[in-house]
UniProtKB/Swiss-Prot annotation:
UniProt subunit comment: Interacts with CALM1.
Name the UniProt record assigns to this protein: Golgi-associated RAB2 interactor protein 2
Tissue: Expressed in testis (at protein level).
Source organism of the structure: Mus musculus (Mouse)
Pfam families in the record: GARIL_Rab2_bd (PF12480)
Domain of life: Eukaryota
Length: 440
């Protein structure tokens, strides 16, 4: 009976120790209930003591002692049900000077004065995960990329329950973090769209705001009116809803009366969405200029635009007719313009003729000259031969014997054969030179 009673008492003590309220509301709760942080932070949902270690599980020592920290999860406002903050607390220097070992001081319940709240980090910038379930080690990764490893430091009979609570709490915190990031992204996008809408409609519809921001210049500058090319306003096509020109008389009464002195002739070709002109029929012959954010837009009469278009079309037609005439004249001319019987000296002292004759080289010209001289020499030889024969024929038959006639024929044949052999051997040399050689 005595043994049974003792066992019952031990079980009751253990059950009393395992009550969640006992270790959930600990030292951090006492600090927060002190009055300094009460209006801003709710009581922590979960609180535990950890020792800072490295990735391999080796403890990190600060001031020759293990660096331990108390971690608590809470919400920044008591109204919020979900936690969104992480609290970090450390021992004061006085508490670290105690002669007892550090592990024993952690197991003992300490007063509220031994802890100091040092960090107050939003869970949006923290990522919690289980690094080692066997060693009861957590990983804390901050938004700047740094990672810290915390190993649970609790009594043996509490370690499993406390660590299981952290394991159950971590996925809930990560889900809330994902939801908050999605909501923040949507809100940021909506703020951006609203800001762009406001910036697009702010002060642009009101022309008086531009007049207040930008001072007016009383002097008007005159420019020459011989500007034929049209100004390109394609860069300013995004200026939508700039002006609603409903009453031109109001614009003229407000002080834009010096428009007639401006003699700029330009064409507004691509500014289609800038203005909505409803009552411009009364001011048909007057040009209206508006100065909006440094851009001058000149409205012209329709007659001027039509005349300009007609002038452009006329010039284009005139140019096309001239081109066609020149082409037809060039095609109708049977013979191209040539320079007949004119020799032009070039760098190499060569000559060419432009009477639709092939260009002759130096060798061809030299051969022609040699042929001409040889023909002249042959004609001279024939004339001399004829004269000799005539003189011989005048002689009487009695004076000329048969032997002399045969001798003259023989000499003539030899001369002709010698001449042919020399011509064949000398090639393109002139025949006059051959004749002189024969005479010698």
């Amino acid at each position: 009976m005595m043994k049974k009673n003792r066992n019952k008492k031990a079980m009751n003590k253990q059950e009393a120790l395992f009550i969640p309220h006992y270790y959930r509301l600990g030292h951090l709760k006492n600090i927060l209930d002190g009055g300094e942080y009460a209006p801003y932070v709710s009581p922590p949902i979960l609180e535990s003591n950890f020792i800072q270690v490295n990735r391999r599980g080796e403890s990190i020592y600060l001031h020759n002692r293990a660096n331990w920290v108390t971690v608590g999860i809470c919400s920044s406002n008591p109204i919020f049900k979900t936690p969104n903050m992480m609290l970090l607390a450390h021992l004061t220097p006085e508490a670290r000077k105690e002669p007892e070992p550090l592990f024993k001081t952690l197991l003992k319940s300490s007063s509220s004065g031994t802890l100091v709240l040092t960090r107050f980090i939003p869970l949006q910038f923290v990522t919690l995960s289980v690094h080692s379930a066997k060693n009861m080690r957590l990983k804390v990764k901050l938004i700047n990329g740094r990672s810290y490893y915390l190993q649970l430091c609790a009594p043996v009979y509490k370690q499993d329950i406390i660590f299981s609570q952290w394991v159950d709490l971590i996925p809930l915190l990560n889900q809330e973090k994902i939801k908050n990031t999605k909501v923040s992204e949507v809100s940021s996008l909506s703020e951006l769209t609203n800001s762009t809408d406001i910036a697009g409609s702010m002060d642009i519809t009101d022309i008086t705001a531009f007049r207040e921001l930008r001072p007016r210049h009383p002097k008007t500058h005159r420019y020459p009116c011989n500007i034929m090319e049209s100004a390109d306003f394609s860069e300013y096509t995004d200026v939508t809803d700039v002006t609603d020109v409903t009453d031109v008389t109001d614009m003229l009464d407000n002080g834009i009366t010096d428009v007639q002195d401006i003699k700029i002739v330009t064409e507004v070709t691509e500014v289609t969405e800038v203005t909505e002109v409803t009552e411009v029929s009364e001011v048909s012959d007057v040009k209206m200029a508006t100065n909006i954010s440094g851009v001058k837009i000149v409205f012209e009469n329709d007659d001027i635009i039509k005349t300009k278009q007609e002038e452009k079309e006329y010039t284009l037609k005139h140019r096309s007719l001239q081109d066609t005439k020149t082409k037809s004249d060039y095609q109708d001319s049977p013979n191209p313009v040539t320079m007949s019987n004119i020799a032009l000296a070039l760098q190499d002292e060569g000559c060419f003729q432009t009477t639709q004759t092939p260009v002759k080289s130096k060798e061809d010209i030299y051969k022609e000259i040699c042929d001409e001289t040889s023909e002249e020499n042959m004609i001279r030889l024939q004339n001399i031969h004829l004269k000799a024969t005539e003189s011989r024929s005048t002689r009487t038959d009695s004076d000329i014997s048969d032997g002399e006639l045969k001798l003259g024929r023989y000499l003539h044949k030899q001369c002709s054969s010698r001449e042919q052999s020399f011509i064949h051997s000398l090639g393109s040399l002139p025949r006059g030179f051959v004749f002189l050689h024969l005479l010698l």
